[in-house]
Amino acid sequence: MRTPLLVGVDVHQQQNVMSFLDSQGQAPRGGLTVANNRPGSEAFVAALTQVLASGDFDGIRVAAEATGWYWFHFFQLLSEHPALAAWPVELYPFNPRLTARYKESMGDLDKTDALDAMVAADWLRTRRSLPASFTWDAGYLPLRFLTRYRYHVVHNLAREKAYCLAMLYLKASEYIQADKQPFSNLFGAASRAVLQEFASLDQVAALPFADLVEFIDAKGKRRFPDPTDNARKLCQVAQDSYRLPAALQAPIQLVLALSLQQITALEAQEKRLNTAIAERMAAIPQTLDTIPGFGPVFAAGIIAEIGDLARFDADEAKIAKYAGFHWRRHQSAAFEAEDTYLSRAGNPYLRYYFCEAANAVRMHDLAYAAFYTKKCREVRKHAHKRAIVLTARKLVRLVVRLLTSRQPYQPRRSATA
């Protein structure tokens, strides 16, 4: 039977507080507080090796709450430290929310750094529902930083566009109406030029119609099939929209212009990130991008979060649960709930990239399109979102199979073929 030394760490920006336990829940030494920097971590390693040498331990397990990135350098140093090479080292970053729930199960405890460290060590001792252990991987981790920052940029872009549309309604209330939009893409080049170069709708209405047509055609790089129709719709928007009070025209115009600049900057960042991600993906052997609609960015987002399939025993059910594609069962006595709800307790980045990939794949693959349509028709409320999540769950199975076999995607033949 293994007898590992268990160490719980309460991580802070300035210091780390450690608690030591053995497999019986006894403390082989008192607590330790060190600075959260390289000298402090070296002091911890020295204390750790002393305890290991004086006791009958055959391994090390260290757990710390994953508070920001304050735990990362500490774990990375431990994973490669030569003084610990003689013992198997397992490092576990704990979700602080789950640690708090485990602490509640231990009764009415005080809130101190030392107790928080002890709770982490005790959770290690029970071995119940431990997360995947930390491994330093120079292949997946750099890619993960890129894909997670892209997630951050994309969400900021969506948020900024929503804010911009709110300001646009104030400037031209009819501009954003679906049946009256003068441009199919409100954030396209021609639309941005109209919004930035005309301070008010009155200026649009005052412009000779032929000049307005030429302006739209030029800003659209001569790609509009009928710029006259766009100009006509724009004039109708100018006629039907509310008039913004004169006192608000200048500030709203400035806010709208700055918001459009921010959108342009975020779109440039997303494009640059997509290029960097594709370059890194070229060095990773995989066949996910052979799935129709499944480009290198979606493949990177999924691969970076999953990492080594061995962490999940190449089990698609474990990966699906890790992504949060898990519906809790609700049963009591003879009652069995018909409605089940998505857990949302998994990795939000992995869930996001699976859902985005599923939305793209269902537009290019007949089997996934049929599955998506079937799920949409099952309900009236939130049909699209529900169908995308269920399609993403279906996609997990295919992704795991391709990552395991490294074979290109082959569409499943129909029964009549």
Segment roles from a protein language model:
Residues 1-417:
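A detector of single, family-specific signature residues
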